[in-house]
Amino acid sequence: MERLERMPVPVLPTFVGALTLSNVYSGLGYTWVRHMTMWAAAVILLLYIVKLVKYTKTCVGEYKNTIPCSLYAAFNMVIMILGSYVYEFSPAVGKMMVVVAVALHAYHILMFTYRNVIKERNVNTFMPSWFVTYNGIMVSCVIGAGMGIGFLKYIVYYGIIIYFVIIPIMIWRLLKVEVKPAVYHTMAVVLAPCSLCVVSYLNVIENKNAILVYVLYACVLASLAFIIIKLPKFFAFQFNPGFAGLTFPMAIGIVASNKMAGFLTAQGKEGIAAMVTQLAGIQTYITTFIIGYVLINFVIMALKIERK
């Protein structure tokens, strides 16, 4: 049970990334990958619930720490994605899971804002992992567009606004304030919010503003380029739970490119759409390696396998 108490918070966002990637593979026809990942994530979620109940004091301590606290939002994101899976077998239960997860996430946003913005502020803990809290709620728009949940459009507009509010301040912070090694990999999270905005907007909003879509996808491309340039430095570190910062952003980036390719095709820009589709293929190739690497290393940590 000690291993359960020590289960790192970043396992949660790692599985959000793995679940998202499994949906990509399912779209390619590899449905078993999706089923296996969904069941594995369900086990991890149950284990984390046990940790919350049995080791409440440990979890409260983690929640008081700004960076882990921002990542706790991934708990709700896992529930949302699992809800979309359950929805296929039981629409009422699946939809309820998504709605409950959104409510929990909204409460988390309020708590996080009070503790880390209103009550006190620390530029050293102001990192891209904050986007997991503030934009992670948009996962509901990624997976729930066909569930008939009326409030999703409000989440889309909230997510886009909060992204444009935070990202310039975040860029300033990354340029002007030293990033500590312990949180270095959270820089990769900058790809997640803009990708979520693209996917959510194209999924939920009927009358789309093409200029807004292009601007958001330009942010995706810039963020992706930033991560690709940083990859050698990211992997220069010995593995630690912070590597989870690379997982979901890269996975949702694939979905954003696929959605953008569809949008461009509908706009009559087949040539550019084909290029974006090929980019999505490259993203899938790189992301599979990254998520596989992180998952394998978490297994090694969990089983206490001695490294040679």
Give, region by region, the residue ranges found by the protein language model.
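Helix-coil boundary and interhelical linker segments in multi-pass alpha-helical membrane proteins
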Residues: 23-32, 84-95, 142-154, 201-212, ...
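Structural signature of hydrophobic alpha-helical transmembrane segments
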Residues: 33-46, 91-106, 150-165, 211-222, ...
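Juxtamembrane helix-loop boundaries in multi-pass membrane proteins
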Residues: 1-20, 56-83, 98, 114-142, ...
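Generic multipass alpha-helical transmembrane bundles of integral membrane proteins
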Residues: 100, 130-224, 229
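N-terminal signal-anchor module of multipass membrane proteins
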Residues: 1-49
